[in-house]
Amino acid sequence: MDQLKPLEHMKADSNKAICKNPPNGNDFRNIFQRDRDRIMYSKSFRRLAGKTQVFFAGNDDHLRTRLTHTLEVSQIARTISSQLGLDLDLTEAIALGHDIGHAPFGHVGERVLNYFSNGCELYKGFNYREKTDSIVVNGVEILPIEFMGYKHNWQSVRIAVDLTRHRGKQGLDLSRNTIFGILYHTALSYGKCPHISAGYCKLRERSKERKCGNPIFHLDYYTNNYGEYQDLRYYSVESSVVALSDEIAQRHHDIEDGIRASLISEAELRLKLMDFIKLSTSEIPEEKHTFSNDKEDFITILSGLFVNFYVSKTITYLTEQFGQRKYKNIEELILNPDLDTVMKNIEIYKVVEGDEQLHRFLKERILSSHMAQVMDGRADFLIRRLFKAYI
């Protein structure tokens, strides 16, 4: 008899999954397989090919788009779930759908759209009206709170539930487990606005009236219309696997793209990596200590080393968190009144010691680099011009 894998007892059960119209007898697939296929064949998924990450896709044919990132997240997540004994179909469905609502131009696109929808910048005909019960900012009335906010994970849910049509019907009719995983792959809200200082908005430095009448980034449109999908009864360990895989993929492609764009030298990264992963320990096979002088060979070897290290740490961490000594099955975990706290403990910086320092290094050298800032500035400009053109 084959030995059970570490978290096979926590595997999500497709037979217990809930959606509006379950698969009928003529469908060869279970509900999670159907979720995966519907996402994969949707227009929203195909559009990911035209959405870039940190750099514009046209800058280099080998730099990533949101689609290639999604496929990498799926591959990493499937590897982890396979080793743990979790449901591969649910894992893949969540991974393929997690970014279908993402803005173009990466997180700068998301940031600008959120500013617009929160009235941080005013465009008549779009985000402010006259004679309404809306919030007053700088003497003009902006959108009511119930229409405010943009965040890509919430938008992904909106696309899956409402905006996409399938066979003439509204929405993809995905299972609650898949939608939950898509929603919870990142934070549900923004932190404190970084542009407010003593009640004044730094974004309005050239404006006569700089007071901010809306200090909170509202997401009320989403929470009012899609708040039901926050129900913790539909949590799965598979959703945590995808959330961690998303972070792993982001670190991985930041490093690769940074090397290709010459933002980080191979020598510097080699030293940083040696310090971070501690190659002298027995965790990494001895033969992998040798790096090639060829850039592409170096990137290939580095990628395998880096991802394998993170995947190994993730498997170990999740086994410790959800092993049989703690929970008999997923139902027992879901009934745990401290489930929300358990979920918050599944963070990449807790999984991999030193990740916060690595992330800070990558942010300083790549995301905050002159090249990335130029690209972000262009993206910001393009989105603003498009808004003015369409309003």
Residue locations for each model-derived region?
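Histidine-centered, transition-metal-coordinating active-site segments
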Residues: 1-80, 88, 115, 121-154, ...
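Short active-site segment of divalent metal-dependent hydrolases/proteases
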Residues: 97-105, 249
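Short, functionally critical alpha-helical segments immediately adjacent to catalytic or ligand/cofactor-binding
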Residues: 38, 94-96
